[in-house]
Amino acid sequence: MVLKLFLSKRPIFLHPHCVSSSCRNSDTTIRLSRRIATMSENKSPLLERARNIVPHLETHRHKGQAGRIGIVGGSLEYTGAPYFAAISALKVGADLVHVFCLQAAAQVIKSYSPELIVHPLLDSNDATMQIEPWLERLHVLVIGPGLGRDRLILQTVSELIKICRQLQKPLVIDADGLFLITHDISLVKDYYGVILTPNAIEFCRLFGNDRDRIMQTLEKLGRGVTVIEKGLNDRIYDSLTLEKYECPQGGSGRRCGGQGDLLAGALATFYFWALECKQEISPAVVACFAASYLTKNCNTYAFKAKGRSMTCTDMIEQIHNVFDDIFEHKKE
C-alpha cells in the first residue's frame, strides 16, 4: 500500500549548521520554470525536504565540504557508465569525485573529463590495500557502474563493501553491484546506510515477482537498507520504517542508456547533503526522491531539445537548468 505523504505537525530537527547556513527556511518560495509545469505543481513534502538539503554556496566554505564522492566501476567494455555517474555527481554539486576502475578503463575515463580523479586499482594484486586509505576520505561511495562481472573483480568489491561496513560508509549500489548483491545478500544485510537502485529486471532478481511480499523480503535485509525501484513511477522502500513512497511520473518515452548512472551519481551527492542536514524523514529517502526528480526532469528537458536523438550526454547537459529551476536557492 502506497502511503500518502503529508506534512507532519511535529518539529523537524535540523543539523545546527544547516539551520544557520546550509538549509533554507521551509517557507522559502521557489519559482519553477514553466517547462516543467506539470511536475512543478506537485506539492510533495519530500520535494520541499529535498530543496532544504541543498547547501548554500558561501565564500567561507572550502573544497570538499559539498561532498567527496567515490565511484567503484569501469572496465574494458564499460567506460561510459562510471563517467556518467561521476560527472553527474560533480554537476549536481559535489566538490570532488574519485573513480576506482580497472587499468584498461583508466585512460579512457581520464580522457572524458579532466575534473575526475581516476585510480586504476581494481585489478591490481593488492587492490583493497591500495583503495582502503581513500575510502576514509570519501563521504559516499557508488558501487557498480561499468563494473563488469569478472569473478576476481567482484571478490575485490565484496572485500571493499566489508571494509565500508566497518567504516560505516554510506553506499549507493547500482548495476553490476546489484548483480553481486543478488548472489550474496549478506554483504548488505543489516548494513545501515545502503541504498540499492534496481531497475525492473534487477528488482525482480532481488525480490522476485510477488509484490505483496516485497516488504517482508526488504525486512529480511535488516533495518537501514533503502531501495529505489526505477520505473515509470520510481518507488522508494524504506526498510527502517517499512514504508513505501512513490515519486511522480515524468520524463519522456526515450529511455537512453546511462540514465541510471546519472541517477546513481546524483543520488550520491544528494545523500551526503541529506546526511549532513538531518530531517525527520530518512536522509536516504529524501536523497532518492531528489535524485529521481532531477533525473526525470533532465530527461524531459533533453527530450524537448533533442527528441528521439537524445542521449545521456544531453541529459547531463540539462542538470544545471533542472537544478536551477527546482532545487536552487532563490533570492527574494
Swiss-Prot record:
Query: Which Gene Ontology BP annotations are present?
Result: metabolite repair; nicotinamide nucleotide metabolic process
Catalytic activity reads: (6S)-NADHX + ATP = ADP + phosphate + NADH + H(+); (6S)-NADPHX + ATP = ADP + phosphate + NADPH + H(+)
What InterPro entries does this protein map onto? CARKD, Ribokinase-like
Claim: Lyase is one of the keywords in the record: yes
EC numbers for this chain: 4.2.1.93
User: Do you know which CDD domains this protein is assigned to?
Assistant: YXKO-related
In its UniProt entry, what is this protein called? ATP-dependent (S)-NAD(P)H-hydrate dehydratase
Domain of life (superkingdom): Eukaryota
Which cofactors are reported in the record for this sequence? Mg(2+)
Q: Enumerate the residues binding ATP.
A: 230-234, 251-260
Q: Name one GO molecular function term.
A: ATP-dependent NAD(P)H-hydrate dehydratase activity
Q: Which organism is it from?
A: Aedes aegypti (Yellowfever mosquito)
- Where, in this chain's numbering, is (6S)-NADPHX bound? G146, N199, A200, I201, E202, F203, C204, R205, D261
Which top-level enzyme class is recorded in the Swiss-Prot or TrEMBL entry? Answer: lyase
Q: PANTHER family of this UniProt entry?
A: ATP-DEPENDENT (S)-NAD(P)H-HYDRATE DEHYDRATASE, ATP-DEPENDENT (S)-NAD(P)H-HYDRATE DEHYDRATASE FAMILY MEMBER
What functional role does this protein have? Catalyzes the dehydration of the S-form of NAD(P)HX at the expense of ATP, which is converted to ADP. Together with NAD(P)HX epimerase, which catalyzes the epimerization of the S- and R-forms, the enzyme allows the repair of both epimers of NAD(P)HX, a damaged form of NAD(P)H that is a result of enzymatic or heat-dependent hydration.
UniProt keywords (A-Z) are: ATP-binding, Lyase, NAD, NADP, Nucleotide-binding, Phosphoprotein
